[in-house]
Design a protein with these regions (language model features):
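Ordered, small/hydrophobic-rich secondary-structure cores
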Residues: 1-20, 26, 87-189
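Extreme N-terminal segment that seeds HTH/winged-HTH DNA-binding domains in transcriptional regulators
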Residues: 1-38, 223-269, 330
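Short, cationic-aromatic polyanion-contact patches
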Residues: 4-13, 32, 66-83, 247, ...
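Short helix-adjacent coil turns
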Residues: 22, 27, 115-119, 128-134, ...
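Conserved amphipathic alpha-helical segments that form helical-bundle/coiled-coil interaction surfaces
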Residues: 118-168, 204-212, 356-414
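C-terminal all-alpha effector/ligand-binding and dimerization domain
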Residues: 172-241, 255, 415-457
Length: 457
């Protein structure tokens, strides 16, 4: 179980939205702490931190030994105003979000269901038969938890929070869900999982998701008036939540510039002062960032000479990454988790992207990859493809998700030269085998036939 203050803030926001939509009303009891721990895959300390903040802000009352009780009240007019503001900001983005998460999260769902045993399916069957929309959330949480990838769980909850799910079954006599249809779709999904049939799982989940999204959009379009003056709220994947990693994000930008940007043909980085000017940060922040890169083994600070770039060098330096540093281990965990998400989703995302790119964009990408082959820098082709998709995809949410995954995945690239020295425990503790890093589907985004067609067109 994770103990994460940033996730506590997500849980806080999750319940605030639930209160405003009257999913939980005045006098209702919240689920017990152990239930919430299982639902969010976090420790009791994280849940208690979220509940403490809800109590301090007057949303709930807590009494030792009893479930928290809802104190929040609002008038019907306040509910209507909140719903109009909430959905008017998101209406245009909802189809994009559903399509994007279908491409990224659904492959993980398929993999999870194929790993389940009969005991797991018994749990899912019990959840599927419950009419409460909250149990549908627990249904999909239980599935995703099977792959033990905190990053996909984070993405699931962030997208759920953006959509305001789950909604109450009814609002003012208007039914949002057909629970009979939903239960039938979930039973079909369980049957496909029992059969270990990835294609059936994919289609069953897609049918459920499209039913729900159609019902939600139909309700919004029928009940929420258009607000032309309200700007669309973009989906932002808050991987770090309220714990901004300034040096971490800056280190990712430096690694990007070494592989794909201004520093790719340099032996030494520019001075701290020049780097600070380029990235718009203080010199002290830049020094701390280089310190992180030194600990990673990506760079080496040499007195009187500057900061040497090691990540592209094949020569022996006597320097190895310090994987005992908590920040480095955390970022390596993000690398492994993003690696899995990219490996499982890249085929579908790339197929969609190639179909929607303009002729000029397809030519630009082809020329980029041909250039890497000619100058023998083909090892960065996957990263350049991910970056290209993050910049040019027609789906805003894919731009956001792949932009974040690209950055997190960069943490692993400087490790290539140290792969033999990487301790096995950092892999095993995240559910991977050491050979996983050298046999990734990310390096075969397209089949040979697809690649040939791409370059011929």
């Amino acid at each position: 179980m994770r103990n994460d203050e940033g996730f506590a803030n997500l849980i806080y926001e999750y319940f605030v939205v639930r209160f405003h939509f009257q999913y939980y009303k005045y006098g209702d009891s919240l689920p017990k702490i152990d239930t919430l721990c299982r639902q969010f895959s976090v420790s009791s300390l994280t849940i208690k931190s979220a509940l403490k903040r809800l109590q301090e802000d007057g949303y709930i009352h807590r009494c030792h030994g009893r479930s928290a009780q809802v104190l929040f009240r609002q008038s019907d007019r306040e509910l209507d105003d909140y719903a109009v503001r909430f959905f008017s900001k998101r209406r245009a983005m909802i189809p994009d979000l559903y399509q994007s998460t279908e491409l990224v999260v659904l492959p993980m769902m398929v993999k999870s269901l194929c790993q389940m045993d009969e005991q797991d399916f018994a749990v899912l069957t019990r959840l599927a038969e419950q009419p409460d929309p909250e149990d549908q959330m627990r249904f999909f949480c239980y599935i995703l938890q099977k792959v033990q990838n905190p990053l996909v769980m984070n993405l699931f909850w962030e997208s759920t929070l953006y959509l305001g799910l789950p909604f109450p079954m009814e609002n003012k006599g208007h039914r949002l869900y057909d629970d009979g249809t939903s239960q039938r779709r979930l039973r079909e999904l369980i049957a496909a999982g029992r059969a270990k049939n990835p294609a059936r799982i994919y289609e069953a989940h897609l049918a459920f998701q499209r039913d729900v999204s159609k019902q939600i959009l139909s309700y919004i379009n029928a009940r929420i008036p258009e607000q032309p003056d309200i700007e669309t709220l973009p989906f932002v994947w808050k991987v770090y939540r309220d714990r901004p990693e300034i040096c971490g994000n800056l280190a990712i930008r430096v690694i990007h510039d070494v592989y794909l940007g201004d520093f790719r043909d340099m032996e030494f980085l520019p001075s701290y002062e020049k780097l600070a000017g380029k990235y718009g940060v203080s010199v002290s922040t830049m020094r701390r960032t280089i310190g992180v890169l030194n600990q990673l083994g990506a760079t080496q600070s040499i007195n009187g000479k500057g900061t040497r770039i090691l990540m592209l060098s094949d020569s022996e330096t006597g320097q190895t990454p310090d994987l005992t540093v908590p920040k480095i281990r955390r970022n390596m965990a993000y690398y492994l988790q993003s690696f899995e998400l990219l490996a499982d989703s890249c085929k579908g995302v790339m197929r969609m992207a190639l179909q929607t790119f303009s002729d000029a964009q397809r030519t630009e990408l082809a020329d980029l990859l041909k250039g890497y082959l000619q100058n023998k820098r083909y090892y960065i082709s996957p990263q350049s493809i991910f970056a290209f998709v993050a910049e040019h995809s027609l789906l805003q949410v894919i731009q956001e998700i792949y932009g974040k995954l690209y950055g997190l995945n960069l943490w692993g690239y400087p490790m290539a030269k140290y792969r033999k020295e990487m301790p096995k425990d950092i892999l095993v503790e995240h559910g991977y085998e050491p050979e996983d890093l050298s046999s990734s589907p990310s390096f075969s985004l397209l089949s040979t036939e697809e690649a040939a067609r791409f370059f011929q067109e």
